[in-house]
Swiss-Prot record:
NCBIfam families: PRK09295.1, sufS. This is Cysteine desulfurase. It is found in: Cytoplasm. Pathway: Cofactor biosynthesis; iron-sulfur cluster biosynthesis.
């Protein structure tokens, strides 16, 4: 059965708008995806009919909201095949999830002289927290270098590991190159050497089925807004045995058992230990609806459609003279490119005049820009609602820019 692209597009209301008198071609979902009506309706319905502060409320609305919040936790656990809903921590997004691990796991388990491995393709969110921790704790940060095609050489990993190495933190899918790292194989190598593994899944969960138990990772993080859900909500999965040993990283309400000015404070069990303060309950409802949406379409069907579109786009872009595409042939979600000597900002600005939305800049990956010796790149990203017609418009727009600017 063919992918129901026309129906899918009709379910995303923002796709109907025009930009600069042109139909919008939204090719920036890797930055943030648009939302289906089902997600918008669920969040609105919660505010209209079900909103209340969760935890400890004895009245009906509070009890219902708490039950719905925990139901979303169960839904997320099933979505990534966690062993238990108690391994699912609600956070603001991928960035906060990684910072939580750095500040809790890192400060508790890592000692001066220990080392952490990251890769050269990481988003700043999976670089800067480790740099901050390394500076504070006297750790060593080791970088797994890229190959020219934007992939990792797995044969290089053993040379980065010694007795001091405690953690590997890497992305599953590069937010710039679309490189799909073989994270299951990488995790197996790292775990065999005694490392803990954190996987940044921000660019993966919307394109492919994720099974954290099969991956055997210790931590997995992703954001809701890239998964067609609301902004301000994300997920940190943590292996339960590790979470039990980790101290809280923020203090406040909801994350305690008892507070005493004389006897001190005792903390709640995970995951609530890591969820201080009033949570983004409406965002949780929207995230649950987003998971329902992609599950209904089927991640396998979504992945097949997107891969077909990606192959079409890569072939079509060959028609543009002096266009340089970065990264491997096999990729997910994104195409990073530059057009001759033209600055990415200028290319993006021209495309916007034609109603085509792409992302330009360093994409929060300055070390990757340095690897390719460029200050910036253009990035077009493909999602389940994009079409071949939009790819054709991108190609035509780039050809037009080439004629105008030379």
């Amino acid at each position: 059965m063919s992918f129901p692209i026309e129906r899918v597009r009709s379910e995303f209301p923002l796709l109907a708008r025009e930009v600069n008198g042109q139909p919008l071609a939204y090719l920036d979902s890797a930055a943030s995806a648009q939302k289906p009506q089902a997600v918008i309706d669920r969040e609105l319905d919660f505010y209209r009919h079900g909103y209340a502060a969760v935890h400890r409320g004895i009245h009906t609305l509070s009890a219902e909201a708490t039950q719905e919040m925990e139901a979303v936790r169960e839904k997320v656990a099933a979505f990534i095949n966690a062993g238990s809903a108690e391994e699912i921590i609600f956070v603001k997004g991928t960035t906060e999830g990684i910072n939580l691990v750095a500040n809790s796991f890192g400060r508790h388990f890592l000692q001066p002289g220990d080392s952490i491995i990251i890769t050269e393709m990481e988003h700043h969110a999976n670089i800067v927290p480790w740099q901050m921790l390394a500076q504070e704790r006297g750790l060593n940060l080791r970088v797994w270098p890229l190959q020219p095609d934007g992939t990792l050489d797995l044969a290089r990993l053993p040379g980065l590991i010694d007795a001091s190495t405690k953690l590997l933190a890497l992305t599953q899918v590069s937010n710039v190159l679309g490189t799909v790292n073989p994270v299951q194989e990488i995790t197996a190598q790292a775990k065999a050497a005694g490392l803990k593994v954190l996987i940044d899944g921000a660019q993966a969960v919307m394109h492919q089925r994720v099974d954290v138990q099969a991956l055997d990772c210790d931590f997995y993080v992703f954001s809701g807004h890239k998964l067609y859900g609301p902004s301000g909500i994300g997920i940190l999965y943590g292996r339960q045995a590790l979470l039990q040993q980790m101290p809280p990283w923020e203090g406040g309400g909801s994350m305690i058992q008892q507070v005493s000015l004389t006897a001190g404070t005792t903390y709640a069990e995970p995951p609530w230990r890591f969820e201080a303060g009033s949570p983004n309950t409406a965002g949780m409802m929207g995230l649950g609806a987003a998971i329902d949406y992609v599950n209904t379409l089927g991640l396998e069907a979504i992945g097949d459609y997107e891969q077909s579109l990606m192959h079409y786009a890569l072939e079509a872009l060959q028609q543009v003279p002096r266009l340089k595409i970065y990264g491997p042939a096999e990729r997910a979600g994104v195409i990073a490119f530059n057009l001759g000597e033209h600055h990415a900002y200028d290319v993006g600005s021209f495309l916007d005049q034609y109603g085509i939305a792409i992302r330009t800049g360093h994409h929060c990956a300055m070390p990757l820009m340095a690897f390719y010796n460029v200050p910036s790149m253009c990035r077009a990203s493909l999602a389940l609602y994009n079409t071949r017609d939009e790819v054709d418009r991108l190609v035509a727009g780039l050809q037009r820019i080439q004629k105008l600017l030379g």
